[in-house]
Amino acid sequence: MDINKVTAVYFVGAGGIGMSALIRYFLAKGKRVGGYDKTPSDLTEELKKEGADIHYEDNVALIGEAFKSPDDTLVVYTPAVPESHTELTYFRAHGFEVMKRARVLGEITKSSRGLCVAGTHGKTTTSSMLAHLLKQSPVDCNAFLGGILKNYESNLMLSDTSDFTVIEADEFDRSFHWLTPYMAVITSADPDHLDIYGTAEAYRESFEKFTSLIRPDGCLLIKKGINVTPRLQEGVKKYTYSVTEIADFYAENIRICDGNITFDFVGPEIRIPDVELGVPVKVNIENGVAAMAIAWLNGVKPEDLKKGMATFAGPRRRFDFHLKTDQVVLIDDYAHHPAELRQSILSVKELYAGRKVTGIFQPHLYTRTRDFAGDFAASLSLLDELILLDIYPAREEPIPGVSSRIIFDKVTIPSKTLCKKEELLDVVAAGKYEVVLMVGAGNIDRLVEPVKEILCKQIRKP
């Protein structure tokens, strides 16, 4: 089936962030778009307002007539949806073309110059930065992102003039193997998704295969020190980047003062002084070096790079400041792997040195909790105070003996609390705070506004 010739597209698992970018793409192309998701969310409601016909019950009777013809309807699904799903089974049994999200994204973008950002962590912010740097310059771009970029309030960007497409290259279920990168970035390769890959070696190998997909006229930009051996085709250039050591692209003269961060960007035959971070957290220096490097390699001028970095507002839920006063700060972040959790905490502690940092963490997935309990505990022990919630299961069934308790018992700081999500607001109301970091990839974000209200009330008390 030629994706460009279908008239209707139906999404099974419409509320996922990657799926929603495709929904917006097909809506922009004038297709009829519908789908199913398990629960309503702000994102699915936004998609409905934009024209998508979405329902929340796995029921074939709710599939609209516009999506009942196998001849002109493409069905897209996410691997998070179980194979036993009733609607998915119906479409397969009735001869519909059924494709994984990753394959559809690969088909859409294969004719453009794909700038693909991969990594266990850092890929959403880095790809969003890169998209913004290109978009606000004459170079321009299309983009499929894994977060809602606040500068544009969308995870999709389209251009009538540019053939660059920035793509967040997701390693889950080996999705990024469907892509054909012109340029690729690897930000990190810390083992994750071991329920899919089985071993850390298999996880690392998937990144090596990803590098073999880069077009011969392209390049790879990889963070210095990552344990990945590229398998590049002949003609593919390789660059490294870093923050703390010399590489092809790196930062130096880093200054952190009064909640602001500036640095000098250094690359082959280029130096850009006094780059200011629009989202001033230390980890964004690293993300920024990678994004600036790819943008510069594709013709973005130094003055546009500086302007873009200063005006970058960040994706939702990536160091998202919800409250920033002299008395208390509230930050929401998506970190859900021990390494990125550690980065988040250290960035906040450096930015707000001398102030008490309280972390509210919701673990994501039973398998990830089981596989990395000790590493999670080590990262969380960097906090001054911890409130630990129950595990958010997402696509998984409970595993006997696996709960937040196995993390909690290994955390070494004395000020720690284990509570259910439903109890959180009462726990927060009983405490006093200076900097609060709410972290996790589940539904902890729905508690950010209620927590903010409690903190604001505490500020107003005489």
Swiss-Prot record:
Name the Enzyme Commission number(s) assigned to this protein. 6.3.2.8
Q: Which reaction does it catalyse?
A: UDP-N-acetyl-alpha-D-muramate + L-alanine + ATP = UDP-N-acetyl-alpha-D-muramoyl-L-alanine + ADP + phosphate + H(+)
Family in the record: Belongs to the MurCDEF family.
Q: Which PANTHER family match?
A: UDP-N-ACETYLMURAMATE--L-ALANINE LIGASE (PTHR43445:SF3), UDP-N-ACETYLMURAMATE--L-ALANINE LIGASE-RELATED (PTHR43445)
Gene Ontology MF: a single term: ATP binding
* Name the record gives this protein: UDP-N-acetylmuramate--L-alanine ligase
Gene3D superfamilies, A to Z: Mur ligase, C-terminal domain (3.90.190.20), Mur-like, catalytic domain (3.40.1190.10), NAD(P)-binding Rossmann-like Domain (3.40.50.720)
Instruction: Give GO terms for biological process.
Output: cell division; cell wall organization; peptidoglycan biosynthetic process; regulation of cell shape
A GO cellular-component term linked to this record: cytoplasm
**According to its UniProt record, in which pathway does this protein act?**
Cell wall biogenesis; peptidoglycan biosynthesis
Superkingdom = Bacteria
Q: List the disulfide bonds.
A: none
The record's top EC class is ligase
Upper classification of the source organism reads: Bacteria, Pseudomonadati, Bacteroidota, Bacteroidia, Bacteroidales
